[in-house]
Amino acid sequence: MISSNDFRTGTSIELDGSVWRVVEFLHVKPGKGSAFVRTKLKAVQSGNVVEKTFRAGEMLPQALLEKSTLQHTYMESGDYVFMDMSSYEETRLTAQQIGDSRKYLKEGMEVNVVSWNGNPLEVELPNSVVLEITETDPGVKGDTATGGTKPAILETGAQVMVPLFLSVGEKIKVDTRNDSYLGREN
């Protein structure tokens, strides 16, 4: 059980038979009446977002999520196949379960797969990944004086804003949490 006072962004709770993740929260203490916690919750399975208000100190069941490190091995008929490298057991996830993570997912990458009651729910990527630029405008000499950026398409299909001096074929490090360029990689 977890108190509504202990909610933080990313906290997972069980509500109405499914897992919900706290996206936003705000502790409100009105001048008259008791305090409450206003939250924005996202259903992990379906992706639905709802706003819900809880009394301050209200106890809710915390979702017991299991994380396991699996390797993305291949795609088959729209499903992403992951393998546990110690037991060689395969786990299949749909494109909906992968969500926005698929724009950085490539074969051979190790990720955390989050499960609830033995059912895989979602994929957690590393905070940063190294990917190759496959398409971008060429950099023109003298463009760097302003320190501008240009769009680049990476090997997984993701689009990221990169500095003007980068060209096709270079490997860059990208932050998967906010889709930002972190630097060149050798």
From Swiss-Prot:
The keyword Ubl conjugation does not apply. It comes from the Bacteria. One of its GO terms (cellular component) is cytoplasm. The keyword Transcription does not apply. Its main location: cytoplasm. InterPro entries: Elong-fact-P_C, NA-bd_OB-fold, Rib_uL2_dom2, Transl_elong_fac_P/YeiP, Transl_elong_KOW-like, Transl_elong_P/YeiP_cen, Transl_elong_P/YeiP_CS, Transl_elongation_fac_P. Keywords: Cytoplasm, Elongation factor, Protein biosynthesis. Pathway: Protein biosynthesis; polypeptide chain elongation. Signal peptide: none annotated. Transmembrane segments: none annotated. One of its GO terms (molecular function) is translation elongation factor activity. Belongs to the elongation factor P family. PANTHER family: ELONGATION FACTOR P, ELONGATION FACTOR P (EF-P) FAMILY PROTEIN. Involved in peptide bond synthesis. Stimulates efficient translation and peptide-bond synthesis on native or reconstituted 70S ribosomes in vitro. Probably functions indirectly by altering the affinity of the ribosome for aminoacyl-tRNA, thus increasing their reactivity as acceptors for peptidyl transferase. This is Elongation factor P. It comes from Prochlorococcus marinus (strain MIT 9313).
